[in-house]
Design a protein with these regions (language model features):
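Conserved GNAT acetyl-CoA-binding A-motif
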Residues: 104-117
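Conserved beta-strand-loop-alpha-helix junction that forms the acyl-donor binding cleft
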Residues: 88, 114-124, 142-146
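Acetyl-CoA-dependent GNAT
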Residues: 28-86, 97-98, 103
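Terminal substrate-recognition subdomain of acyl/acetyltransferases
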Residues: 81, 139, 146-158
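A short beta-loop-alpha structural element at the N-terminal edge
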Residues: 2-15
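Conserved acetyl-CoA-binding loop of GNAT-fold acetyltransferases
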Residues: 129-139
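Conserved acetyl-CoA-binding loop-helix of GNAT-fold acetyltransferases
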Residues: 89-104, 125-130
Length: 158
């Protein structure tokens, strides 16, 4: 069973591990730099909310939630999700997205937008669409993969 809750400081090392795994895979996050304990603590503390998915074995997934813009567009937020590779396909991502959607509303955001969903990430796209997110279009070659090739990205919102 998975529980999603707000992160606490002792969670940071496990969060960094999950985050860095996705960064190293190079097919979902735009970030290229890995987090260390200091940069991870600062990064997670700067978010509007970080949620962690916890099982008996520890933290197996996480999300970050923050404003996507400022001023007149400050009611739009953005989020990123990470699930450890050995736990994918077990609906942990869905639990994270649902908790994030609830948190976004509680924080006063009116729109949740994903700027750069890699078109080849079929599992994420199916999940977002099943939860009611709408695809805004496609940006050809908007994401540079680890192998140097460029993949399309699909912005989504709800």
């Amino acid at each position: 069973m998975v529980t999603v809750r707000a992160y606490t400081e002792p969670d940071i090392p496990e969060m960094i591990s999950v985050w860095n795994e996705v960064v190293e895979e190079g097919n979902a996050f735009p970030q290229e730099e890995l987090l260390d304990e200091r940069s991870g603590a600062e990064f997670f503390a700067s978010q509007s909310r970080c949620g962690v998915a916890v099982t008996d074995s520890g933290i197996v997934g996480m999300y970050i939630l923050h404003p996507n813009n400022v001023g007149r567009c400050g009611h739009i937020c953005n989020a990123s999700y990470a699930v450890s590779s050995e736990m994918r396909g077990r609906h942990i991502g869905e639990a994270l997205v649902r908790d994030c959607m609830k948190s976004a509303r509680e924080l006063g955001f009116r729109v949740l937008q994903f700027n750069a969903v890699v078109a080849e990430n079929a599992a994420a796209r199916r999940l977002y669409e099943r939860l009611g997110f709408m695809q805004l279009g496609t940006i050809p070659g908007g994401f540079r993969m680890n192998d140097g090739k460029y993949a399309d990205i699909c912005p989504y919102y709800i």
